[in-house]
Each structure stands twice: as C-alpha cells, then as structure tokens.
C-alpha cells in the first residue's frame, strides 16, 4: 500500500473529520484522481516535440499518456481540427498516491524560488489546479536527455463539497500553501 494512502486511512481521515466538524467518517473528502496535462505548442510544425513530451510524461507519471487533439481549427495558432497538440494522463488508486508522494516530498522542494502554492487556485468545488514550469523538477526525467524545457498542469480532483474541505484535505497531506 502506498505510504500516503495508509497515512490517510490511519491518521488524516480522523484529523480532517475533527477539523471540519463532520459527523461521519464517510463524509471526509478524499482525492479521487490526479490529471497531468502537457500542451505542446509547436507540435503542429515539429512531430518530434510531441514524442519528447510523451517520453517525459511517461517517465513522470509511470504510465503511457493519451495524445490530445485539437477540437477545432485555429488559423492564428496554425492548427487544424484533429491535429495532435499535447498529451495527458489520469492517475487513480495506488499510482495516484505514489505520484502525490513524489510530488510533495521530492519535486516541489526542487522548484526554484518556491514560496508556496496559492490557496486561491481552488475551483469552488474543492479541486485544485497547479502548474509546473519545468519538467526537470521530477527526478525521473534525465536532464541530459531532454530536448527542451516543458511545463505541465496538474489537477487534483477531490470528493470535497467546497474549497474549505479541499484545502483541509491537501493541507493534511502536507501541501505547501502560502
């Protein structure tokens, strides 16, 4: 069992229940999935950029990403409908907790000039989104083998009813807020 999952079941659930004043342990919010998204700007001109993004995402997430395609043509961006423009991965279960553990314990401390994540990035329903500017903060990505620096979006989807519950959940996991 993943370290964070066992900590959540043994300690964090009761701690969050007491903090939020919930009556039943089943009302305690939990993380349902983590979605990683990497948009590749120049993928329409150079197909090798997308291959590099897929390789980086596979190393970071531990599973092969699905390639996302443009929904409609945009002349200003020089893309057409159905052209590949990025990749994404949805993590659930054990892999989700393993990724969250690596994110909090290893990747976030390696971010340069990091002062904590904004507590305002919740969506109103307890889900949290954050962006990472460089994929090299993850130790799985070899610095010598990358062709260029890429950022990625991370969305943590929770079963929380509102932002207060989502913030309490992520704070219990040790998420560094400002």
UniProtKB/Swiss-Prot annotation:
SUPFAM superfamilies: RL5-like (SSF55282)
Cystine bridges: none
PROSITE patterns, sorted: RIBOSOMAL_L5 (PS00358)
Pfam families in alphabetical order: Ribosomal_L5, Ribosomal_L5_C
Record flagged with keyword Zinc: no
Record-level Gene Ontology MF annotations: rRNA binding; structural constituent of ribosome; tRNA binding
Biological processes annotated in GO: translation
Superkingdom of source: Bacteria
InterPro entries hit by this protein: Ribosomal_uL5, Ribosomal_uL5_bac-type, Ribosomal_uL5_C, Ribosomal_uL5_CS, Ribosomal_uL5_dom_sf, Ribosomal_uL5_N
Gene Ontology CC annotation, any one: ribosome
Keywords assigned by UniProt, alphabetized: Ribonucleoprotein, Ribosomal protein, RNA-binding, rRNA-binding, tRNA-binding
Record function comment: This is one of the proteins that bind and probably mediate the attachment of the 5S RNA into the large ribosomal subunit, where it forms part of the central protuberance. In the 70S ribosome it contacts protein S13 of the 30S subunit (bridge B1b), connecting the 2 subunits; this bridge is implicated in subunit movement. Contacts the P site tRNA; the 5S rRNA and some of its associated proteins might help stabilize positioning of ribosome-bound tRNAs.
Family note: Belongs to the universal ribosomal protein uL5 family.
PANTHER family: 60S RIBOSOMAL PROTEIN L11-RELATED (PTHR11994)
Record's subunit section: Part of the 50S ribosomal subunit; part of the 5S rRNA/L5/L18/L25 subcomplex. Contacts the 5S rRNA and the P site tRNA. Forms a bridge to the 30S subunit in the 70S ribosome.
Name of this chain's protein: Large ribosomal subunit protein uL5
Organism in which the protein naturally occurs: Psychrobacter sp. (strain PRwf-1)
